[in-house]
Each structure stands twice: as structure tokens, then as C-alpha cells.
Amino acid sequence: MKNLVKNVVLITFFMSFIPVSYAQDDVEEVVVTANKKAQTAQEIPMNISVITEQSMLERGMAKPEDFLRTLAGVSTPGGDVYYTIRGLNTSTAQTSSGTTSTFIDEVGGSSMHLFDLARIEVLRGPQGTLYGSNAVGGTIRYITNKPNPDEMEAAFSFELGTKSKSDDSIRSLNAMINLPINDNTAVRATFSSSEDPGIYQNIATERKDIGKQEDDSFRITLLHEDGPLSVMARYGKAESDDFGQKEKGNADKPGSADIVNPACSYSAEWYYGDTCTRVFALAAGSNFSYDPDFAFYSFTDEQEQGETSVLTEVIKYDFGKFDAILIRADYDFETTAITDWSRIDTDDLYTDILYYNSSGSRDTTELRISSKPGDIEWTVGYYKERFDSDPGPTEVEPTDAGGFDYVTGYMGFTSHSGGYDPTLYPAPFNNPYLLYGSYNYYSYTEEKAFFGQVDFKWDNFVLTAGLRDFELSDGFKGSEYGIFYEGDLGCDGTSASGTTCSEENGSESDTRPKFTLSYIPDEDLTVFLVSSVGYRNGGNNAALPPFCANDPEAAGFSRRFKSDEAKNTEIGVKSRGDNYSLNATYFWVDWTGIQVTVRPACGWSFTYNGGEAETSGLELDFSYNLTSNLYLDFSGSFMSAEITNDIDSLGATAGDRLPNVAEQQYNVGLTYDFNVASNPAYARFDINHYGDSYATFAEDNEDMSPSYTKLNLNVGVQLESSYVQLSIDNLTDERTEAFRFSAESPGYRPRNYLQWIPPRSISVQYRYGF
């Protein structure tokens, strides 16, 4: 594999120089702001992909899931939020992006709807100098269309479709209006709503719509420009409602758990092997008609609802010799969820629901000063971010009378010396059948940083040097309640028995550099060399509960973990001619002090610095105009991602492949422009190949998501100010696991999580704008 990559790199670099002499007369430049200043995608010294508004339309992209698996170097277990770039992932069960960051314009955030966006910028490689923590593998930026004072604009679209394996319809509605107030001021408002039907079936509750996702969002933006002054204010709000189990591998997208095996016979025995559990047997005894490929058995249908709002102010001023920008963002968020814990605590015999609630705020401030274009260009800035969670109950887990007697029975009433009485706890933990609860007194993280970057230009060369000097601090204080704790009397020493107290604080500081050297002999060729470093914030773990003490996966537990470091080196070339463009990059990353998130089968989780890894590979973006109206494009990556040290608690040995990483992936697209009754029309056909991946280091077949090839078709026609488009996703209805994870410890409670790639969907979309 490594020799193949090296050979492809050499061939690609050699070929990229051959057609340089064919100059382009007319080049439609794509301008990006990835380096906090306007540059063309051709000249910027990094591997960047740009998805334009027109490309989103032609490819039928409505949500991030539609493009994430088509990008070179991007791996995701599915869904719209969680992804990794360049293989930088070690979590055996990925529930946070961790090594990547996402921005909407100048502030952190993600867009669930790809509507009224000017473009999407995908920045590969560590971006810690300008974008701070978590931009280890890269950054994705959603660039919105801004208010336009010159004219009134309006647009709307609606989509209606069907999805294989679901009786419900795909629905989406988007609307935008732009209103000029005067020559210098305008307001722009957008609204989006979507519903993606579920395909999973819960035998216990006899529901066949598990996995349904509903998302609503709006934003309203005011822009005022007066000479050197520009002021933009925006308020946005997003709401989500996900109905279904969010499996360990991907807390973003509902999936299924413990797919029914028809070969399992009904029995009261606890354990039949790795593929037959008690839930299989219970399901086999049900009269509910179900599809075994999509069915599972869970006492309770899980649900999660989220709400996020953000107020943003951006003030720019042109001082003549330099530009200054102040960016402020205030976030408020709340998440509520109900999850089924009958698998963990009551052995699928009794109802056991864990109610979760989290709310808080996040404030960010960035002040940046940049020079004007010239032989020496510089940017310096200050950044501050503060996150605070609201005090209050976060988790409450009551069972019923039967479940309570069952748990106290198998614990032999050894807990609390046989005198466990949850009614002595404060509300809402005073439920007589409470098994577990948690309370947050405070939790915060804070990051402060000074950063700078300077470009030196001479002849056809540009040297860039950057540095970020950061300080991190964080802390929390909380209590836990329940039958699993005894003897503790809380933080003040006067609480009822079984009330723990956890308090931890910490801080650290460090620097992260960046250097690039680019050679630009003309507007059609750029060769660049990059050395950059990324990092993730350190933090604290809550105390390990006693019921996890003997779990082998908890062997590496410690109360504090620090920032990790990813040192990236890459060499790339961007070349274009009359009918082609090529972007090729070879990278290698040395990742140390890795924050490994461990989620033992006991139901807990913690993070520690326990890993070292290396990733390397080739990323290719290529387009070629076959004729004046037939266009070919290719985007793909071929990489190696391996751990370089043993991690006993995860069963990882040096040389093992990093989890949830597809080492090969590519997307080939063919677009054909034509006319229908004198109206412009297009047809686009995509072949998307995604390589296999494993949820754990062990590379066990039970944790393997196989490779697949999916076909998509989009056909559209423009009718004056409107578009009509037919989209078919997964044309052949390919059935493959997008994510699969088996938790087999402890052996009597195995859990098998599964998420299919989206089945075939057929939809019609209508867009109108003026």
C-alpha cells in the first residue's frame, strides 16, 4: 500500500507539470478565506476543496451527510456532524468530532441544511494557528450568502421523496428573503425544515419508524456598510428531534442495536454466544411482523431533542494601512434525551430509562488585525472562548418496582448494607426506584490565545510562518447518587448515604507553529510544502465508579488528561490547463499524546493520553472537460493510519489500524449539460466508493463495516427563475453497514450496534428564486 501511494504521488506530480504550457484564457477563479484573507483556491498553500452553491445543487446535496463521504481524506461513521480527516481518530466508539472543527463564516458551528450557502471550504491538515483547538485533522467552513443592499432577493425550495424500507416521506422546505433597507443596509433571513424518515423497527414497542430525524433552523442577518465600516449582526437558532437509538459509534445519527437473529430460539437462558443474546430470544417469541435486517428489541424508544441559539456580531474597519475585525458570538444550548438502560442494569427484563438534560452557554471573542496586500502580509490576533454548563440535575435513572427488586436482588443487597433508601435524596433523585442520578454544580472550559501569521513574497516564492500561543483552563464539580455508591455523604458531608462528590480543576499552556513554502511561477501552477501542528484541549475525568473498577477497558483511567499534538508535513501541487484542474497532496502526520476516549461495557466513559499514531497518504482532486458540455471529476484518498504503541486497555498493538478510518475512498462524477425545449438542463451521475473500516483496533469481523460502492443520479432543468430536479440516492439500493460495533464485555450483556448506509431514496425538488 505504501509503495503504491509513493508511486502514484510521483506519477501525479510528473503529470501535473506536463500541460503547464497550455495557458487558460478565461478562468473562473474561486475565492476563499481559509487563511483569514481573500485568496484564490489555486494560490492558497494548502489542500483545500471547495463545494460551490451550483455544485451542491447539481449533486442534490441537502445536508452534510450528502457530501462528507465524497471528500478525499474524510472518514465518518455516518450522519451529519462527526467526521475525521486524514485518519486522525482513536475512539473505538466515536461520539464527538474531536480532531476536526466546523465553522459558519467566522464563528464555530455547523449547518444542518445546505441552503443559501455561497460555498463550503474543506481545509485538510492541522489548522491550529488560525482556528485553535480541535482543528487537528482539518476544518470545514460553511460560507453563507450575505445581505445584499443592491436589490431585493427571494428564494424557496421544497422537496418530497420516498425512502426504501420506510412508509414515511422525505420532506424539506427552505426559504430566503433579502430586503434592502437603504443603499448601505440590508437584512437577509432564511428558514429551513426537514424530515428524514426512520427505517428501523423496535419489536418491543412495535414501532417501524425508528431513526426519524427532524431539523428546523432559521437565521436573520443585518448588514450595514458605510465607507470603511462594516457591521454585521446575526441571530440563529437550530432545533433537532431525533427518534431512535443513538448507538455508541455515532451519537449523531439514530441507528439500530442488537439486530435480531432468526436462528435464535426462545429461551430464558442468559447467553447463547456472540450472536445470540436474551433479546434475540425475546424477539423470536414476539408476534410482531418485522424485517430482521432492520429490527431490534429495546424496552424503550430513545429520543433526543436539542436546541442551540447563537447571537453573532462582526465589526470590520478599514484603517487604510491595515484592516481590523472584531467577532463576538454568544451561544445558548440545551439537550434533553431519554435512553434505554435496561440492557445494562436490568438484563432486558424491566423498564430502565435514563433521563438526560444538559444546558449551558459559550462565549467567544476574536480580535484580528491584518495588513493590506503586498510583499509582506501579516495577520495578528487574540482569541478567547469560555464554556459554562448550567447547574442542575443532568441524569436521572429510575426503574419500576420489579426492576428495583431485581437489581437489589442480584446485588445481594450488599450496597448500603442492605438499607438503600433513595427517598432520602433531594428531588428529583428521591424516586423510590432510583438506580442512578447525577448533579452538576459547575463545569467550565476556557481558552485564551494570541496568534499570528506572516507571508514573505519574493519572485515566485511565498514563505509563511505562523504561531499560536494558548492557555487552557477547565474544571467541574458534581455529585452522583444511587444504589451503586455507598458511604459517601456528598460535598458538604451532610447528604444521604450514596452521594458522591467529584471536583477537579486544571490548566496548561503551550505553543503550536506553522510554516509553509509555496512556489507560484504562474497563475496555473502552485507547488507547496507545509509543516503545521494541531492540538485538542486537555480536560478532567469524573471519578471512576466502583462498578467499572474491574473492567479491563478501564485500566488506563486517570483524573486528568492533557492536550495532544499532531505534527503534519505535506507536499502538494495544484495545476490547471484549458480543460483540466488537478490538486494532489501527499501528507504524513506524527500524532503523540493522543486523547483516547474509552467507553467500557460497564456504561461509563473517560479520556486519557495513551496513544501514538502515524498516518500518511495521498489526496487527489481532479476535473477534466471531456467536451464542451461533458465534465468528469474525481476526488479520492489512499492512506495508511496506524497506532505506533501498545495500548493494553484497548487491546491495541503497535501497527494496528486506527478505528473508524477508511483507508481508501473516492468519488467519480460525470456531468452532462443539455437543453430541454430550449431550457438549460443537466444530468449528473456519481460513483461513490468507501473502503472498509473497523470500530476497534482488533479488526474483528463483528466490528467491521465493509467497503461499498454507491451510485447517485441527479437530473435537473432550469425554467427561467426556477429549477426542477430529480434525485436518486443509492440508485441500486446497496445494503451495507455504515457502522458496526459489538461490545462483548461483560459477556452476559453483549450489545451489537448497527447503522446501515442510507437506503435508496427518490425525491423531487423544486426551487424558485428572483
Regions found by a protein language model. Name each.
Residues 374-379, 457-463, 581, 586-591, ...:
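Gram-negative outer-membrane beta-barrel transporters
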Residues 207, 213-379, 386-387, 582-583:
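Outer-membrane beta-barrel domain signature, strongest for Gram-negative TonB-dependent receptors
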Residues 98-99, 114-119, 124, 129-218, ...:
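Outer-membrane beta-barrel translocator/receptor signature
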Residues 222-225, 369-370, 375-385, 441-589, ...:
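Structural signature of Gram-negative outer-membrane beta-barrels, strongest in the C-terminal barrel
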Residues 174, 314-318, 323-329, 333-339, ...:
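Membrane-embedded beta-barrel scaffold of Gram-negative outer-membrane proteins
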Residues 26-151, 571:
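Acidic, small-polar-rich N-terminal luminal/periplasmic segments of exported/outer-membrane proteins
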Residues 199-209, 245-297, 340-354, 394-440, ...:
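Solvent-exposed loop segments that connect transmembrane elements
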Residues 402, 677, 688-696, 717-770:
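C-terminal beta-signal and adjacent terminal beta-strands/loops
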